[in-house]
């Protein structure tokens, strides 16, 4: 059975049907019958992620909830109150179903390469270019690393000229994290210490941040497709054991999101992103990188497929195929032409691809190369000279 902690997490996403004090933020698609029509694929998605779930029990509980939901939608004033109580009594049926991960489009078979330890932290600290705040698990840079960091940020933005720059909020409600099926224990909770403040997290530039502006959005026919946006800046996670550029709780990242009307179009977007990011890191920064399709056990709950661009076992960039898993939960749709005698109505939930590149990890590997005697590209050397 799905762990209870996951059921509790989904209560914010399904606040409308659960009751209690949770804030109603999101209206996810609750007709999940098509998920259970693909039982074999669902079992594969669970097994490859090492999740033990009684699929039949989840399905039966959900069917009972959905049957009550359909009655509630059509109920008259006399019976609607009683049916609402029944919905809340059977809420586990919905919460269990919402806790299920995305189906798997394709998974790789290559083992995760051995991670080569980085020496950048000790080197930069000795040079007086980095200070490690062990209490808050963050690092502070000065001097040329800041120049290189800024340069990489600008170049990554230029790498995707078709992506519209946005400045999303650094905060996300619990319902947004649940819609993405992200483990909240990896995020930093935020509060103003008032009793009525809703459960909120500091996420910075991330998938929750870049998708939140489109919550409950319906794109019209006049939009140019695919719709693509990007943002860059600090990203935040909970504390880790190691504090350096690769593991600090505050790291500089570049994020890009594509939304398409066609699942078939995602393949081209993914291939293009793999080529652009891989070529930039390899040819632009002279880093030895390899693109690897991740195994099923490495997939995040919202991913159906993912590729990582790695340098000596360290992931520098991740390209995620999401499909319509997130858009159905955040209610992000597109509307098109109405139905005619010759064609069906053209509307649905958008298909997504998400690319996240860790700028601080790139900087760490550039410093590692420098320690080993490898010179950085000339334009980086020139930029460093100008900064002095």
Q: Where are the predicted features?
A:
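N-terminal alpha-helical targeting/anchoring segments
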Residues: 2-131
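TRNA-recognition modules of translation machinery and tRNA-sensing kinases, especially anticodon-binding
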Residues: 34, 64-67, 110, 115-388
């Amino acid at each position: 059975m799905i762990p209870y902690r996951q059921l509790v997490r989904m209560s914010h996403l399904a606040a409308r049907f659960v009751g209690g004090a949770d804030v109603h933020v999101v209206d996810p698609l609750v007709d999940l019958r098509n998920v259970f029509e693909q039982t074999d694929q669902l079992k594969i998605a669970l097994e490859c992620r090492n999740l033990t779930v009684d699929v039949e029990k989840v399905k039966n509980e959900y069917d009972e909830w959905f049957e009550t939901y359909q009655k509630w939608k059509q109920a008259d004033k006399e019976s609607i109150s009683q049916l609402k109580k029944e919905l809340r009594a059977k809420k586990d049926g919905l919460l269990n179903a919402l806790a299920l991960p995305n189906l798997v489009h394709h998974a790789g078979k290559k083992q995760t390469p051995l991670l080569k330890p980085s020496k950048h932290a000790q080197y930069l600290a000795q040079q007086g270019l980095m200070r490690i705040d062990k209490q808050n698990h963050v690092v502070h840079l000065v001097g040329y690393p800041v120049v290189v960091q800024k340069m990489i940020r600008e170049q990554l933005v230029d790498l995707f000229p078709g992506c519209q720059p946005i400045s999303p909020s650094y905060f996300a409600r619990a319902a947004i994290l649940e819609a993405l099926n992200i483990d909240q224990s990896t995020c930093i909770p935020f509060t103003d210490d008032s009793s009525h403040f809703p459960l909120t997290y500091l996420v910075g530039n991330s998938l929750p941040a870049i998708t939140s502006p489109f919550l409950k959005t319906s794109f019209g026919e006049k939009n140019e497709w695919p719709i693509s946006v990007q943002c860059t800046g600090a990203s935040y996670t909970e504390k880790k054991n190691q504090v350096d550029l690769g593991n600090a709780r505050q790291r500089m990242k570049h994020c890009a999101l594509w939304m398409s009307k066609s699942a078939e179009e995602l393949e081209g977007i993914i291939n293009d992103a793999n080529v652009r990011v891989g070529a930039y890191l390899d040819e632009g920064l002279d880093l030895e990188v390899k693109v690897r399709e991740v195994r099923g056990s490495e997939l995040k709950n919202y991913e159906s497929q993912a590729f990582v661009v790695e340098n000596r076992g360290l992931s520098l960039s991740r390209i995620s195929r999401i499909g319509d898993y997130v858009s159905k939960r955040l209610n992000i749709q597109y509307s098109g032409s109405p139905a005619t005698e010759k064609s069906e109505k053209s509307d649905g939930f958008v298909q997504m691809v998400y690319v996240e590149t860790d700028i601080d990890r790139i900087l760490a590997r550039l410093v590692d190369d420098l320690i080993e005697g490898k010179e950085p590209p000339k334009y980086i050397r020139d930029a460093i000279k100008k900064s002095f």
